[in-house]
Curated annotation (Swiss-Prot), chain A:
Belongs to the peptidase T1B family. Non-catalytic component of the proteasome, a multicatalytic proteinase complex which is characterized by its ability to cleave peptides with Arg, Phe, Tyr, Leu, and Glu adjacent to the leaving group at neutral or slightly basic pH. The proteasome has an ATP-dependent proteolytic activity. It comes from Caenorhabditis elegans. Pfam families: Proteasome. InterPro entries: Ntn_hydrolases_N, Proteasome_beta_3, Proteasome_bsu_CS, Proteasome_sua/b, Proteasome_suB-type. Keywords: Cytoplasm, Nucleus, Proteasome. GO terms for cellular component: cytosol; nucleus; proteasome core complex, beta-subunit complex. Transmembrane segments: none annotated. This is Proteasome subunit beta type-3. The gene is pbs-3. It is found in: Cytoplasm; Nucleus. The 26S proteasome consists of a 20S proteasome core and two 19S regulatory subunits. The 20S proteasome core is composed of 28 subunits that are arranged in four stacked rings, resulting in a barrel-shaped structure. The two end rings are each formed by seven alpha subunits, and the two central rings are each formed by seven beta subunits. The catalytic chamber with the active sites is on the inside of the barrel. GO terms for biological process: proteasome-mediated ubiquitin-dependent protein catabolic process. It comes from the Eukaryota.
Curated annotation (Swiss-Prot), chain B:
InterPro entries: Ntn_hydrolases_N (IPR029055), Proteasome_bsu_CS (IPR016050), Proteasome_sua/b (IPR001353), Proteasome_suB-type (IPR023333). One of its GO terms (biological process) is proteasome-mediated ubiquitin-dependent protein catabolic process. PANTHER family: METALLOPROTEASE TLDD, PROTEASOME SUBUNIT BETA TYPE-1. Belongs to the peptidase T1B family. It is found in: Cytoplasm; Nucleus. This is Proteasome subunit beta type-1. One of its GO terms (cellular component) is proteasome core complex, beta-subunit complex. PROSITE patterns: PROTEASOME_BETA_1 (PS00854), PROTEASOME_BETA_2 (PS51476). Keywords: Cytoplasm, Nucleus, Proteasome. The keyword Nucleus applies. It holds the Pfam family Proteasome.
Amino acid sequence: MSIMSYTGGTVVAMAGDECVCIASDLRIGEQMTTIATDQKKVHKVTDKVYVGLAGFQSDARTVLEKIMFRKNLYELRENRNIKPQVLSEMISNLAYQHRFGSYFTEPLVAGLDDTNKPYICCMDTIGCVSAPRDFVAVGTGQEYLLGVCENFWRENMKPDELFEATAQSILSCLERDAASGWGAVVYTITKDKVNVSTIKARMD
Amino acid sequence: MTSFTGITAVANATNEMAMFKQAMKEVAAHPEWMSSRQIERQRWNPYSMEGGSTCAISGENFAIVASDTRMTQNDINILTRDAEKIQILNDNIILTTSGFYGDVLQLKKVLQSRLHKYRFDYRSDMSVDLCAELLSRNLYYRRFFPYYTGAILAGIDEHGKGAVFSYDPIGCIERLGYSASGAAEPMIIPFLDCQIGHVTLSEGYERPELTLDRAISLMKDSFRGAAEREISTGDKIHLVIAEAGKPVVVKFLPLRED
């Protein structure tokens, strides 16, 4: 079994019309054993920028601390909020600095920039960024998610539609991915508020 | 006294050549510069995977089966754009298989000949339930050198209801409402879970009925979604529709070709 699927977990993000949705499951495991059922893999960076870290959760924690450190330093030096584009570049650089001994985590960035344009991107473990206009997924349930998202995503979805599409996608994924589950948390980021919903899913 | 030296020289040379050949053979069999893992990797493998995906949905009085028609080598090299993975065994049994194409063809042949013999012995067509059991046993018969295929058997059972049977390579059988197998299985299955199984819908909500038209459009959607992301799936959808009391309909629908 690969280290990338040791703890399990899945993160997905979808872009809409002046809004983005980012969701993750809540399970942490040690291979087949479930250790915790309340671990969000999505973290707040600024009011409108969130980062998701799938993969090996021990590394994910370390990477999160490094991300927060660099983001704080950036905001102190520049005296402005960090844009999602900048943050993803920063994380990409951080990941590539460890090119030959990488952190086993795949980061995902979702947020709105200062013109409220949605931005989503995902990376591999060494920071190769892919920023499509529709949706991204990382983690053990990636394949399951991409299949469903491909059918649910439409152009210019409003926040409530976007939430529904994201929630349905991750729930369908959790149905089949044994390494993720125990509920999901969905963040809907719009220009004036962030809506957090915890959704019940299979408990096995 | 000097006349025989030529012959011994030739004899020595032949002997030397034989020894050289022997040494070459030995070193080819046990190359010392390669790790055991490298040797393992280069060894001949009786199996290969030609990609592609198949899917089947059953309803109250129908069963539909679809597969793509692409055949690939090493997931990137397209061997043909019209390889058929669906076999209509008789008016109410359809077999669809993906995986190792050699075994796909062999499995099809084996079932065809068994059905032919059944027709000869009993003067009637086999029912889908019987065929499902037959296929399971045929797969398990090869327990230790399996057919490297994910098979799905679909059709109309004796009561006129749609049936889908799903198998693993060694014949573990399950009757399901819908099933998928092949490279894009993880992309198709959760979508059908959501749309047909309604697993993400809370209790108390109205569930739309699964009509033939809805099943066909879901099938098209799932293959379009799969072809978008999975590179060994594409080119055409080969769609077979079996409805109780009606002849089997075969359709080809376009899909991504890149």
